Amino acid sequence: MTGPQAAYVETVGKNIAVQSGLSNARGDFTVTLLNSPVNNAFAIPGGYVYVTRQLAALMNNEAELAGVLGHEVGHVAARHAAKRQSTATRNSLLGALGTILSGAILGNSALGQLGQQIFSTGSQLLTLKYSRGQETEADNLGITYLQRAGYDPRAMSTVLQSLANQNALDASLKGTSNQVPEWASTHPDPASRVRAALTRAGSTPGRTNRDAFLAGINGVTYGDDPAQGIVDGSRFTHPGFRMAFQAPNGFYLVNGTRAVSIAGQSGKGELATATYSGNLSTYVKTVFAGLSSQQQLQPDSIQTTTVNGIPAAFGTARVNSGNGQVDVVVFAYEWGPQQAFHFSTISQAGQSGQFDSMFRSMRRISASEATAVKPRKLSVVTVRSGDTLQSLASRMAYTDKPMERFLVLNGLTSSSRLTAGQKVKLVVY
């Protein structure tokens, strides 16, 4: 990303990176604010440090942002990547279905095992898996860098708490278990990391630069970028492609630059695109062929139809996964002479019908509908006399759990007291 928010993050990142001893020159580091709606940050050798706009927006002061970036630089300074037993893994930062279908989420079920084999698409960014000891060492190094830079070292504990709270909120929104978030975690649980970081930081004073931080990130895009499509509850709309569809009840959507994942307790899926030569039946066969490198997926037959005036074709393959049978469905739409989109879904045998409403909901949106799609943005506001948690939360651009979202975004609790003149973050259109 470019712009004032990216420039601000770059400045903070370089200031904390030079505390690592990797280099004393700020110019030796490249700090990038990524246009992603996922909470993540990472660094790689060579002075490259990355943080997503979504994670930056979760911070509540500059010290917290510096702590996150310092933690990631700490991994590089301690040469954790070189010490790992396995090489860097390609993990979905932007919603790839491979992660959604992994055994980490689905366990050893037939659905989970087959999902690990056949789905590997979606947009990805490099993230690194570290051991428990390495994560703890990076936390400690981040705290050291905060102290050297004059920041309040306790910021490391507060940002870890915010991440744990965001993770719990995400799980509640999705109706899933409280999965440990990618950045917050790899092995140590967030609660223990919060306690350890607070103990390590001690009572050393330092600045937080809250006002500078809030001014620096004010106006940043929050959540999905319309250029990549917008998820609003169970509805996905892409103004560029003039497309919209509705996920089935009980399913949630995760958006990415190249794939939209659909996940629920009884099935998973994604919407993606592939090279299209003008023949939908051939397209469906090609998608099936590309889904698995370990076993051949052949649909029983391919049928053609129309959905809301859009030419479509679909097929189903029943597969033995070892723990039972599953159905894999590919449902494709001709969007133009050289463009097609398709759903790929997986569910236990006989349950693929739960996706029928989604397949039939695909439609082209009008120009006016496309124009009406607006991004959510972070807005820093000043609390006025008479404002309450409830009144401010009601201004959030969400219909689901606005209060919970407001509290997590601002690091507050339901018992927090507001004072006139205090600044808080809102998400607005």
Tell what function each PLM region has.
Residues D400-Y429:
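Extracellular LysM carbohydrate-binding repeats and other cell-envelope/extracellular binding modules
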Residues M1-L106, T127, L141-N178, E182-W183, ...:
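Peri-catalytic and regulatory segments of divalent metal-dependent proteins
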Residues A66, F251, F343-P375:
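Surface-exposed amphipathic alpha-helical segments
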Residues D225-G256:
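N-terminal "mature-domain start" segment
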Residues A367-D400, Q422:
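Primarily a LysM-type cell-wall glycan-binding module
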Residues A289-P337:
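Signature of long, low-cysteine stretches enriched in small and polar/charged residues
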Residues A244-A289:
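Secretory pathway targeting signatures of secreted, lumenal, and periplasmic proteins
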Residues G229-F236, V260, V307-R318:
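Short, hydrophobic/aromatic-rich segments at coil-to-beta transitions
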